[in-house]
């Protein structure tokens, strides 16, 4: 799927039976959630449910990658269908139907990162300084770049904590990292969005975010 499919109103309705707004700042996440809802709906027609494990939309592109685990049974199907609905974004647009459940699975992402670490060369067992590693196996520059991109995507997704509300708010000229730290210090949950480096999601009310932004 291309997230740009979710921008023209007619295309979104025709392909996914959903509504979205090309003017909404959460357009990339909306596209991801519409695709996840379409996946859950397709599974439900065959008596199956889905667990969304990882979603990724590479910066600078309009493509979406979704990894899910299919589960058999009517109970799993009903549980997935219950996570599909409509929602209002912080920009005031009503969108959907879309997936309202988590977009990342922390246990799955930790296993992915552990697998990435396992692909690194082991420490030198024949002496040498602590932490010294054997020369890495030859790898093409393209393969190395893919490995770096995969690790970064997993790390960003893991940091975008499950359990926070859908959708994010733009941080303007303020540092997203600084605002996340300020919100956490004030007792709120917050994380940077994995879909836009200048946006964050939080359980804090909008007024609180605005006050911190102006401080």
Give names to the regions the model predicted:
Residues 1-215:
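SAM-dependent transferase fold signal centered on methyltransferase-like domains
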């Amino acid at each position: 799927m291309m997230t740009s499919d979710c921008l023209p109103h007619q295309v979104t309705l025709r392909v996914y039976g959903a509504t979205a707004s090309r003017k909404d700042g959460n357009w990339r996440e909306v596209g991801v959630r519409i695709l996840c809802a379409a996946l859950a709906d397709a599974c439900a027609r065959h008596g199956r449910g889905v667990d969304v494990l990882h979603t990724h939309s590479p910066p600078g592109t309009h493509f979406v990658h979704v990894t899910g685990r299919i589960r058999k049974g009517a109970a799993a199907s009903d549980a997935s269908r219950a996570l599909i609905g409509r929602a209002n974004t912080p920009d005031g647009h009503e969108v959907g139907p879309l997936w309202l459940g988590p977009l990342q699975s922390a246990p799955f992402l930790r296993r992915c990162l552990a697998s990435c670490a396992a692909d690194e060369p082991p420490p030198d067992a024949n002496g040498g300084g602590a932490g010294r590693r054997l020369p890495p196996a030859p790898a093409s520059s393209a393969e190395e770049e893919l490995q770096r991109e995969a690790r970064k995507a997993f790390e960003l997704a893991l940091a975008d904590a499950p359990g926070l509300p859908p959708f994010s708010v733009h941080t303007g000229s303020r540092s997203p990292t600084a605002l996340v730290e300020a919100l956490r210090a004030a007792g709120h949950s917050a994380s940077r969005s994995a879909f836009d480096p200048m946006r964050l999601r939080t359980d804090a009310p909008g007024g609180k975010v605005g006050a911190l932004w102006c401080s």
